[in-house]
Amino acid sequence: MRFLHAVPGVGVATVSADGQTLGSAGFGQVAGPATLPSGTTHFVLKAPGGVTLKKTVRLADGDSYTLAGLATANAATIHVYRNGAADPGKARLRVVHAAPELGDANLALDGKVVAHRAAYEDATDYWTLPPGREQLEVRDPGSKKMAIGMRALPLSAGTTTTAYVVGSKGERVRVVLVDDATTAPSAAPQTGLGGLAPRDGGPNWALAAAAALAIGGAIALLRRRRPSR
């Protein structure tokens, strides 16, 4: 379970489930993930100014969800989106319209409209895409003007992602990416001195040092075997 704060004009909000605090987030931020048991769960969102929202949801065993605080005409509400599973080797993407002042919107990927007149709070189906970068545009269906120009969305193989379009009421419209699911790595995790493998693709210094020692030993052996003149 993750929590997305998409209520403009509201300060840092805190979400709890059955009395247990899950996390806090400011506008456009995401808290979590948190693991919850399946079954009926009572969520409470609290924010400054006496804002208190409540939602009761039945969580299915093994499913993943994102709880989003969304604005309404006069206040706010909680909406729970069920997340899709990841597909090994593929990238999956959907878009959620969470910017009320945009009205209905056309959504385009790499210049092609893939969702017509998406309404506020709507979630598109997931699209299965090749890993890489997708250019997202949000367009006004009437004027065809772009509410959001092209935004490059990085999509990795084996991941499922939701792009939440948030904003309005003084908050600039933007895209917030939320990780919905990830497939398990196909290879066993690397281990070494200290039990940690490099995470940024940098060199493994323990292996580099061992290689240097091996090369040095080989050079010394060759020198010893070289006949004297």
Regions found by a protein language model. Give the residues of each.
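Intrinsically disordered, low-complexity polar regions and short flexible loop motifs
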Residues: 1-229
